[in-house]
A protein has these predicted regions:
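Sequence signature of WD/YWTD-type beta-propeller architectures
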Residues: 2, 21-181
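Sec-dependent bacterial lipoprotein signal peptides
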Residues: 1-21
Length: 181
């Protein structure tokens, strides 16, 4: 009996997902051994596209540690993210704003998990959970980069948090006491 299997790389997944959206106009993005392009021989994961499809943010092990990369789909090249990635730091779960200016991600640079927003224009990082107790994960940034939502266990269970970067404060989210059957 013959066994058939299908292995999809990030490029393969991107091709399948976006192929239908672009009416069959596929991007042909080769794998590069040293990682100068979108795909490398290292593990690539957690892809997120900007609203207009111009930018793709993802995580890769290509430098020998988990790092965040930004790919310009129109130019078909990686873009630099100065000051974002450093050896020995775990950074993952990226989310990108609609215009590609802001990247929210989870970092363990301070010995605990934090949600950080990187501004590509100013090259600055804002740790929005610096004073929070507990773990945080799975950030998602709004299209304009003002709001960041993520999971937090600071109340003793995993809950959804919403942070407003405009006023630099979490939005109060009252627990819902309803149960659903």
């Amino acid at each position: 009996m013959l066994k058939h299997s299908v292995n999809l790389s990030l490029y393969g997944l991107l091709l399948v997902v976006l192929g239908g959206c672009w009416g069959g106009n596929y991007l042909l993005l080769p794998t590069e051994p040293l990682g100068g392009g979108l795909n490398s021989l290292a593990r690539e994961e957690s892809p997120q596209l900007s609203y207009d499809g111009r930018y793709l943010v993802f995580v890769s092990d290509r430098p020998g540690y988990r790092a965040i990369f930004l790919f310009d789909v129109a130019q078909r090249q990686l873009l630099p993210l100065p000051g974002l990635n450093r050896p020995g730091m775990v950074q993952d779960q990226p989310s990108i704003s609609g215009d590609g200016r802001y990247i929210a991600f989870r970092s363990e640079a301070r010995g605990k998990s934090d949600i950080v927003v990187y501004d590509r224009l100013t090259r600055q990082q804002e740790i929005i959970t610096a004073t929070w107790q507990g773990e945080v994960q799975f950030p998602a940034i709004s299209g304009d980069g003002r709001f960041v939502t993520f999971q937090s266990d600071r109340s003793g269970q995993w809950n959804i948090e919403i942070y407003d970067r405009g006023v630099r404060s979490p939005l109060p989210v009252a627990p819902n006491r309803q149960t659903f059957n």
